[in-house]
Amino acid sequence: MPKVEIYKSILLEKIGKILTKSELVSVLEMAKAEICEFDTVNDKIKIEFNDTNRPDLWSCAGLARQIKTYLFGHLPLFKFFSMADNLQEFYGEILVSPEVFSIRPFIFGFLAKGVICNERMLETLIQLQEKLCHNYGQKRKRVAMGMYSSDLIEFPLSYTACNSDYRFIPLGMDREMSIEEINRVHSKGIEYSTILASFNKYPLLLDDKDKVLSYPPVINSHDIGALKVGDTDLFIEVTGTNLEATLLSLSVTACDLHDMGFEILPVKTIFPNETLFGKEIICPYYFQNMLEVNVDNVNKMLGSNFTANNMCLDLKKLGISAYFKELDKFYVIPPVYRNDFLHEVDVIEEIMIGMGLDSFKPELPKDFTLGRLSQIEEFSRKIKNLMIGMGFQEMIYNYLGSRTDFIEKMNIEGDDFLSVANPMTEGYEYIRGSIVSDLLKSESISSNFPYPHKIFEIGKVALKDLNSVDGTITYDNLAFLMADKEFSFNEINSLVSSLFYYLNIEFKLRESSKSLYIDGRGVDILINDTVLGGFGEVSPYILRNFGIMVPCCVLEINLNKLLN
């Protein structure tokens, strides 16, 4: 979970109220945060956040804004945001080339002027940059940020792609280096260039005089890419692979700098292709959607009997605008610096926090029940023990993933896969319909470990089902993978036979037509003419998609059907 260090005196100054240690501990619960350490000598507090969905809190300015709003009920106002129907005046342009749009497509920026940067302010900004890029930005893969002195920059900027022999002086060095050399020698290149490993060109940000600002998301330039004490005019840019995550990171930073006293001046980005919010976007940009919330649903979930007006007032404590036109529903307008409202239940959680957790009286359960393992759980545990006994290592994966991993790399249509309507990131846009893709992904990053590799998982998969009430059906599946140059169909066939022998279940095999397998080396498993799954040698085409160089055999069977 994210941890930040902030200056206590600055925090209390921005809140506008002196808080004792116990009062501060109490009010931090509202932000799902707790104090890890008090450093009275250096005037610092180390705070850990128990929620990764609120990057707006990972700074002194953001946390102070939330506490101040909670204590005094004043909604923060940021007038420099553009909206689809209300565009602000812009003070610079970023031109995106078609070449870079297929590599790392999104870049946005703004100018911040009017405050002299001191040492503590720079420390705060650098910490915010690191937390946004590392935690929210998935170690710069999804989002990366650059900060510069705008006095050294000539607009418009050009965001383009270059070859590996392009040379400039990177930050922390005193000589020119090629992109290839930076990737190989520079500490940041070694750490972050793998993000771009699948491309033969690299992102580059230049100003109108062809001076290099940065090689995103790896390293800034030596000449322009470092802030220093005494700078007054700043340029902030954020690049990324996810449009909304990139916009939100920029919005969070803009709000923080505004709260520090800076004047925020928007910058326009011009893309070669249309995006979800248009071909030209003036940033900071407000893109969040309004939510409709049913009053009865809130009261049912919280066990309360509040009116829409009560709920709107509780949301206001957390900086969330809400209004009602009807008695049975109200509308929520997310703050410009938040994008974590995916469903009505997220609003209900905020209402509960706004009411105060101590306002809910605990109640003992009224019904007495006996718990026991379900049949499928008992069956799964039996199979798990058998797999471990046969030398396999258990894996546990997320149920959500990307279309690339679940569908495209597996060379399937994916028509029966379930997609998330409003995913936070492209890495969590689909619910898995098979475990095999997860096993192959693990194998793709395990080539440095001694062979053979034998891994398995027993977990849930979900698919579309038009005959069910909600249009979906969930199964418990077993899948395993064997990887070694010596493994072939004979080895996996022997293991499958052993597994069914210990389960005391008879089965039949027939040749499979799935593209997952090499032709003639994959079979379906049948019991009473019902297909329960299959196994075989994985197609070299699919292995190449995952970057796997060693032959693999896989099995996947439906345990619910097997149990029945």
From Swiss-Prot:
It comes from Borrelia turicatae (strain 91E135). Keywords: Aminoacyl-tRNA synthetase, ATP-binding, Cytoplasm, Ligase, Magnesium, Metal-binding, Nucleotide-binding, Protein biosynthesis. The gene is pheT. One of its GO terms (cellular component) is phenylalanine-tRNA ligase complex. It is found in: Cytoplasm. Belongs to the phenylalanyl-tRNA synthetase beta subunit family. Type 2 subfamily. Mg(2+) binds at D340, D346, E349, E350. GO terms for biological process: phenylalanyl-tRNA aminoacylation. Its cofactor is Mg(2+). This is Phenylalanine--tRNA ligase beta subunit. PROSITE patterns: B5. Pfam families: B5, tRNA_synthFbeta. InterPro entries: aa-tRNA-synth_II/BPL/LPL (IPR045864), B3/B4_tRNA-bd (IPR005146), DNA-bd_dom_put_sf (IPR009061), Phe-tRNA-ligase_IIc_bsu (IPR045060), Phe-tRNA-synth_IIc_bsu_arc_euk (IPR004531), Phe-tRNA_synthase-like_B3/B4 (IPR020825), Phe_tRNA_ligase_beta2_arc (IPR022918), PheRS_beta_core (IPR041616).
